[in-house]
């Protein structure tokens, strides 16, 4: 397929760590598919920067969760978005790629599209789960959608939105058979004996809301299973600092906190207690029994409940189309309930075998060589623009 011979400029925005991961994968594919040099710039995180991305703003300025929590950051986010749009319209890159962060990116994408700059969005918003009215905004803003999940293109096609199913980069990255023994050696954990990975989130608000409940659940589990060990990844020194008071309050826990390495920590585990989010898909790809939980402020929870369509929030259940792992949310997420459910996941060997089959099928479906497939879709959009010019 022909491509422009002059230097390309691609603007991109990722708004949170999961988007940084996806965008870095896409950048790796683009660097192989597109001619060098191509200038990639905009807003991104550490993984994107490691791929040669030129980030003009700090990604964490856009990282918020929930309606109530976002209110204090709205002025700063609007300022950054305004500056970004002015820059795009002045410099006119060959395309704009928004990676997730739909509430931020759709506005930018519509401005780019209205100005004749192709707009590509990576990660279809979960319009099939809640806020389905966003499909109208997508149709106005997006020239081409890169979809992580196989059922999404059919939904978009009905609204006249071009799309490509590219799979999920985590499915390419994670082996079909996880090396639990090797992960335990890497973390200095005993080869034998039960291990539970606990992931309470990475944001201050998440730790404040669910951290104490998770630690109380761990204490109950330790009482019932004295030989039980826990592993908890802390992505940053700041997160470790947030967790330290909870660690100090539970000195009896056989707990190992790792510096990052969340995937290794989950691989080492026999079961996982995890806050809802992309990490639940990672746990499924690692074939681990899990309990999914979250707590958000009351108002945020009410809005989410009223705008939701599905009875589940965890990606493993959404992709399976049924409850394959338990979810304990909001006031149902008590220490007792979390401890009971997690120990059941740990002990039930028949359930473990069933989950391995379900998660392996899921893994194979999502393993699509995402970086190359997404890069090829971007190249097609760029080529279409060249032919129209």
Swiss-Prot record:
Protein's recorded name: Lipid-A-disaccharide synthase
Reactions it catalyzes: a lipid X + a UDP-2-N,3-O-bis[(3R)-3-hydroxyacyl]-alpha-D-glucosamine = a lipid A disaccharide + UDP + H(+)
SUPFAM superfamilies: UDP-Glycosyltransferase/glycogen phosphorylase (SSF53756)
Annotated keywords: Glycosyltransferase, Lipid A biosynthesis, Lipid biosynthesis, Lipid metabolism, Transferase
GO molecular function, one term: phospholipid binding
Top-tier EC class: transferase
Upper lineage: Bacteria, Pseudomonadati, Pseudomonadota, Betaproteobacteria, Burkholderiales
InterPro entries xref list: Glyco_trans_19 (IPR003835)
Family of this protein: Belongs to the LpxB family.
Function: Condensation of UDP-2,3-diacylglucosamine and 2,3-diacylglucosamine-1-phosphate to form lipid A disaccharide, a precursor of lipid A, a phosphorylated glycolipid that anchors the lipopolysaccharide to the outer membrane of the cell.
Pathway it works in: Bacterial outer membrane biogenesis; LPS lipid A biosynthesis
EC code(s) of this entry: 2.4.1.182
GO cellular component: membrane
Species: Burkholderia multivorans (strain ATCC 17616 / 249)
Gene Ontology biological-process annotations: lipid A biosynthetic process
Entries under Pfam families matching the protein: LpxB (PF02684)
Top-rank lineage group of the source organism: Bacteria
């Amino acid at each position: 397929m022909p491509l422009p011979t002059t230097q390309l400029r691609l603007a991109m925005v990722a708004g949170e760590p999961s988007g940084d991961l996806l965008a870095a994968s896409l950048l790796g594919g683009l660097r192989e598919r597109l001619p060098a040099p191509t200038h990639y710039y905009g807003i991104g995180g550490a993984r994107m920067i490691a791929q040669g991305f030129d980030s003009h703003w700090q990604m964490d300025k856009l990282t918020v969760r929930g309606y109530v929590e976002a209110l204090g950051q709205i002025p700063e986010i609007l300022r950054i978005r305004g500056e970004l749009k002015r820059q795009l319209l002045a410099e006119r890159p060959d395309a704009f790629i928004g990676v997730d962060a739909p509430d931020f990116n759709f506005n930018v994408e519509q401005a780019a599209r209205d100005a004749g700059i192709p707009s590509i969005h990576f990660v279809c918003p979960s319009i099939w789960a809640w806020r389905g009215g966003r499909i109208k905004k997508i149709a106005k803003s997006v020239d081409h959608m890169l979809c992580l999940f196989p059922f999404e293109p059919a939904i978009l096609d009905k609204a006249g939105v071009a799309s490509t199913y590219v799979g999920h980069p985590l499915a390419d990255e994670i082996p079909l058979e996880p090396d639990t023994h090797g992960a335990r050696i890497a973390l200095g954990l005993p080869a034998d004996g039960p291990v539970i990975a606990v992931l309470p989130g990475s944001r201050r608000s998440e730790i404040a809301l669910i951290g104490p409940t998770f630690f109380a659940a761990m204490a109950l589990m330790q009482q019932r299973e004295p030989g039980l060990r826990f592993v908890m990844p802390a992505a940053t020194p700041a997160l470790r600092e947030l967790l330290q008071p909870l660690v100090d309050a539970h000195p009896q826990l056989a707990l190992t906190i790792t510096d990052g390495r969340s995937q290794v920590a989950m691989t080492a585990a026999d079961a996982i207690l995890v806050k809802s989010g992309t990490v639940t898909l990672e746990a499924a790809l690692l074939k681990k029994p899990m309990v999914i939980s979250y707590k958000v402020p009351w108002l945020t929870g009410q809005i989410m409940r009223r705008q939701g369509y599905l009875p589940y929030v965890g990606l493993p259940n959404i992709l399976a189309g049924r409850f394959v792992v338990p979810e304990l949310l909001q006031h149902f997420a008590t220490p007792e309930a979390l401890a009971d459910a997690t120990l059941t996941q740990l002990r039930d060997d028949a359930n473990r075998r069933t989950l391995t089959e379900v998660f392996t099928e899921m893994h194979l479906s999502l393993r699509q060589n995402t970086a190359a497939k997404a890069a090829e879709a971007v190249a097609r959009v760029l080529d279409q623009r060249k032919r129209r010019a």
